[in-house]
Amino acid sequence: MKILVTGAAGFIGSYVCKRLLSRGDEVVGLDNINSYYDVNLKYGRLGTLGIDKNTVDWYKFVQSNTSEQFRFVRINLEDKQAMRMLFANESFDKVVNLAAQAGVRYSIENPYAYVESNIDGFLNVLEGCRHYKVKHLVYASSSSVYGLNGKVPFSEKDSIAHPVSLYAATKKSNELMAHTYSHLYGIPSTGLRFFTVYGPWGRPDMSPFLFADAMLHGRPIKVFNNGDMLRDFTYIDDIIEGILRVIDHIPTSNQDWSAQNPDPSSSTAPYKIYNIGNSHPCLLYTSP
């Protein structure tokens, strides 16, 4: 099976590539290696996949020196022509879209980057899946879509009508766009809402790294809402196990779906939404 993994230099994407390769799939990894955080970390992850950073260049396919089944190419998702050529030339069986402009607070200062990558870029992925008959699109959503929803633990059946960041709004938009393409063109799609993923090679902007770095350097840990909060932390291996199982489980139409009592996580279209790493929140702090 030939699978495209976008965001292959990212935390989750690099692990997905390794697992797919370990089971014998052919994998094409894509990433733009932007500077949202230290690019050396991204090149380091690619190094674990056999990609020499000195060979990486825009639009150039690089063959892994550790696996004949893995190639990497540097492309921006929002580059419509490059994405069209990629899909046309490679004939992917399945797509795992993990590329996105990440970060909740960063979206406040850099809104256009989120629309370009997370909306325009995702549209290019959907169009590739549509025109080149991809059998299953798996894509990253986010727990951020729950926004002002105060009920915990979150459920896929909960409302996501009130996002509180542009990042969350783009992820909600991805779910709506995917459903539209599943409905109009019959493209099976599965969206995964991740909850604070941590582990080796993790992102330096995420709370586990920030907490540990502050403690190591004797700085106070920044907390919000007076520190009174719940948070789900999910180990990377558990996330990857969930993704791999979903890749092989292609969604079908839910024949029991009712327009009078709609389930937002499924549809009459081949469409599904899952929470990955949710339901056991950790109490971080209780105010006296």
Regions found by a protein language model. Name each.
Residues 107, 195-196, 258-259, 273-275:
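Short-chain dehydrogenase/reductase
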Residues 1-197, 247:
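N-terminal Rossmann-like NAD(P)+-binding domain of SDR-like oxidoreductases, especially those catalyzing
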Residues 133-137, 187-188, 220, 226, ...:
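Active-site loop of short-chain dehydrogenase/reductase
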Residues 212-221, 233-273:
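Alpha-helical substrate-binding/gating segment
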Residues 118, 235-239, 283:
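An acidic site on a long C-lobe helix of protein kinase domains
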Residues 285-288:
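Conserved small/polar residues in nucleotide/adenosyl-binding loops
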Residues 164, 194-205, 225-236, 278-280:
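Glycine-rich "substrate-gating" loop/helix at the edge of Rossmann-like oxidoreductase active sites
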